[in-house]
């Protein structure tokens, strides 16, 4: 499966200029209340080139005359948090899923990035700048763009979103298969609601049948 993500990274790198780098963020689950978060869903463009579905991960890609560099940054394991939310992904697991051999720790990303930036001759940084909320919370990419402008104002910022839109416009066969499967599961969910619906039933009771069908399929 990781050949899919490798191919997608190759397609992205082919659209990037020489002496440019890309940084993509998986994102983080929004806080619901107290110590409870909403379910996490990775940034879809990050997932498209990594296959990783864990939060707080960063993908770094660079393209120079010496070749291509790929590094996936993941959180360190935390024994205390592991008891509450489970263990973090290991470096071996991250490589197995993504096909990326070079795995770093997320807390070392900014120092690694700064070191690479000033020794490699990189002239452009690509970030996924999609943002649909003027007054909403800024995305990790927008916050990182501000840091780049602050510490390296000469750097050009490119927007990855149009590149991904072009790449993902025509679906690969594996994507079509997943879409067909999603439609089949949705149909099963609707049929489950129809079978369980009764007079005077609450909406959440009917919804439960739909949600259960999706979870078990």
Predicted regions and their residues:
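Active-site pocket-lining segments that scaffold enzyme catalytic pockets across diverse folds
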Residues: 174-217
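A composition/biophysics-driven feature that prefers long, compositionally simple stretches
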Residues: 1-188
């Amino acid at each position: 499966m990781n050949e899919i993500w490798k191919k997608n990274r190759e397609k992205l790198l082919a659209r990037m200029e020489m002496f440019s780098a890309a940084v993509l963020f998986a994102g983080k689950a929004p806080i619901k209340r107290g110590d409870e978060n909403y379910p996490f869903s990775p940034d879809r463009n990050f997932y498209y080139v990594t296959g990783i579905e864990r939060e707080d991960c960063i993908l770094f890609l660079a393209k120079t005359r010496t070749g291509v560099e790929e590094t996936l940054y993941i959180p360190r394991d935390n024994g205390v948090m592991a008891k509450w939310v489970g263990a973090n992904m290991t470096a071996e697991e991250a490589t197995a899923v993504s096909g990326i051999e070079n795995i770093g720790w997320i807390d070392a990303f900014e120092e690694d990035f700064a070191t690479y930036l000033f020794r490699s001759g990189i002239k452009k940084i690509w970030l996924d700048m999609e943002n649909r909320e003027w007054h909403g919370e800024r995305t990790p990419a927008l916050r990182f763009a501000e840091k780049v402008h602050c510490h390296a104002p000469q750097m050009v910022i490119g927007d990855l979103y149009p590149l991904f839109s072009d790449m993902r416009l025509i679906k690969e066969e594996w994507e079509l298969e997943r879409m067909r499967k999603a439609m089949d599961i949705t149909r099963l969910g609707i049929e489950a609601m129809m079978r369980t619906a009764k007079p005077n039933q609450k909406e959440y009771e009917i919804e439960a049948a739909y949600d259960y069908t999706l979870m078990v399929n």
